[in-house]
From Swiss-Prot:
Native organism: Homo sapiens (Human)
Modified residues (Phosphoserine): S129
Sequence ranges assigned to domain PDZ in this UniProt record: 108-195
Name of the protein in its database record: 26S proteasome non-ATPase regulatory subunit 9
Originating gene: PSMD9
GO molecular function: bHLH transcription factor binding; transcription coactivator activity
Superkingdom of origin: Eukaryota
SUPFAM superfamilies reported in the protein's UniProt record: PDZ domain-like
Amino acid sequence: MSDEEARQSGGSSQAGVVTVSDVQELMRRKEEIEAQIKANYDVLESQKGIGMNEPLVDCEGYPRSDVDLYQVRTARHNIICLQNDHKAVMKQVEEALHQLHARDKEKQARDMAEAHKEAMSRKLGQSESQGPPRAFAKVNSISPGSPASIAGLQVDDEIVEFGSVNTQNFQSLHNIGSVVQHSEGKPLNVTVIRRGEKHQLRLVPTRWAGKGLLGCNIIPLQR
């Protein structure tokens, strides 16, 4: 392989997707470099513990005769080069871990979105299979300008929910009357079926110029 091919190969590898095995290989390389650095420090230690900065000449300016100058210079040079390599590898490890963590977060977000979508699909499927909720009452008249008219109620709207009253707990119109009396000035959620479509309304029982707090007439539907 030529130098150019080697550079291209290396570039394409770096541009690829980072894997756990890539990080493991970088960690192995890091440990290998650290072992080499220690080995070279051991060489310096064996030479009178000379270290990285002690002079290699005596007080008269002559090369020291009590140490192997070649070994010391070589070990010092190796340590400097290896420390640079170690710094570069640590940067690669940091970048690789960052990519892995970012990918994990993206995967978690995708999984959560997919789970939410699936749950919503199941819920929608259940709703469709159950069909529209059954109405328990019907609006048969509305006075203009009344709270019911302002809320958007229309004649022939079939009520499936009126505040806390619904198909499951409705017994008589007294249930609706009780909710209205206890909700004067407070918004009530009212759900109706109008021409086959469900509509959500907010009705506020209020004293007005006409009779009652709603200004509409509601009749029960036969079950």
